[in-house]
Amino acid sequence: FKASEALILTNGVFSELPEPSIRRFCVDQLQEHCMRVGTLARAICNGLHLPEDQLDVASMAGILHDAGKMILISSFPDEYWRSILESRSRYFPVFGAERQALQASHAELGGYLLDLWGLPSPIIEAVTYHHEPWLCSQSVFSVTDAVYIASLIDHERQSNLADGWSEPINIEYLQSLGVADQMDSWLRLHKATLAE
């Protein structure tokens, strides 16, 4: 499974949405976010000298990390919109507002969808836990952590009109992995990603 296949999958899913939903949820900006997260997650893993196969997984997981939002946009647009508004008004992570409204977050729905599609388990895990990587059983830095970091950096620096509130990066968690000192370099990598 290659990054190009991830792009084809996301483009296919995004293209099935009705035009009003594309505008309401700023789907073009969401696609751009997913691309930046894939690029940055790969760069983060590369900087930490993870194996080449993990770099590919990071790219694919980053590109697909918000696939569950497509389920929400297409099947539960009003509930999802209310979750976004609730998130903004309460400064509460949007994935938590989704869970309250629908008993599942976009991350969990995305992981389930990718599992149904038969994608590799490291991609499914990264998508499912990209907001809460500490719930995984790993005790060393992983692709899931890279997608978590890349997504939050991009949300912080490039938020769009259909975003909910995003929590800050959990520095204590990064300290437990021994990588908190890398934040400045990851922010520079993000800036370079924007220039591409």
Model-identified regions with their sequence ranges:
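Terminal helices and disordered tails flanking the catalytic cores of nucleotide-processing hydrolases
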Residues: 171-196
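Residue-level signal for pocket-adjacent positions within structured domains
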Residues: 89, 97, 168-174
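Acidic/His-rich, divalent-metal-binding segments that scaffold phosphate/diphosphate chemistry
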Residues: 1-115, 121, 125-128, 136-146, ...
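A glycine-biased, small/acidic residue-tolerant capping/turn segment at secondary-structure junctions
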Residues: 159-169
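Short hydrophobic "helix-edge" motifs at membrane interfaces and signal-peptide entry regions
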Residues: 55-56, 140-142, 170, 176-180
